[in-house]
């Protein structure tokens, strides 16, 4: 009585599919996957030495400044 058989799980799955629909479940799974991916990326970035992170931000700032200057000249 305490354990669930395969039929119990199939009924639960069918009810979940009826309530939420496959579109919501698919988009929810995609969102969860991208959140896990971003979390892992953040954990990897945390392991980098601070000097490397500073160099990357300087490069990004320089490219933004160049892009801003280009946009100003285009006007």
Swiss-Prot record:
Q: Report the record's disulfide bonds.
A: none
Q: Which Pfam families does the entry link to?
A: TatA_B_E
GO terms, molecular function: protein transmembrane transporter activity
Q: Where does the source fall among the domains of life?
A: Bacteria
User: One cellular component GO annotation, for this chain's record?
Assistant: TAT protein transport complex
Places the protein is found: Cell inner membrane
UniProt family annotation: Belongs to the TatA/E family.
Function according to Swiss-Prot or TrEMBL:
Part of the twin-arginine translocation (Tat) system that transports large folded proteins containing a characteristic twin-arginine motif in their signal peptide across membranes. TatA could form the protein-conducting channel of the Tat system.
The name under which this protein is listed is Sec-independent protein translocase protein TatA
Recorded source organism is: Stenotrophomonas maltophilia (strain K279a)
């Amino acid at each position: 009585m305490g354990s669930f058989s395969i039929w119990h799980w199939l009924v639960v799955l069918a009810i979940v599919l009826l309530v939420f629909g496959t579109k919501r479940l698919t988009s929810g799974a995609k969102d969860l996957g991208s959140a896990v991916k971003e979390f892992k990326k953040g954990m990897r970035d945390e392991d980098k030495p601070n000097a490397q992170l500073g160099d990357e931000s300087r490069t990004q700032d320089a490219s933004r400044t160049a892009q801003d200057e280009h946009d100003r000249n285009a006007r």
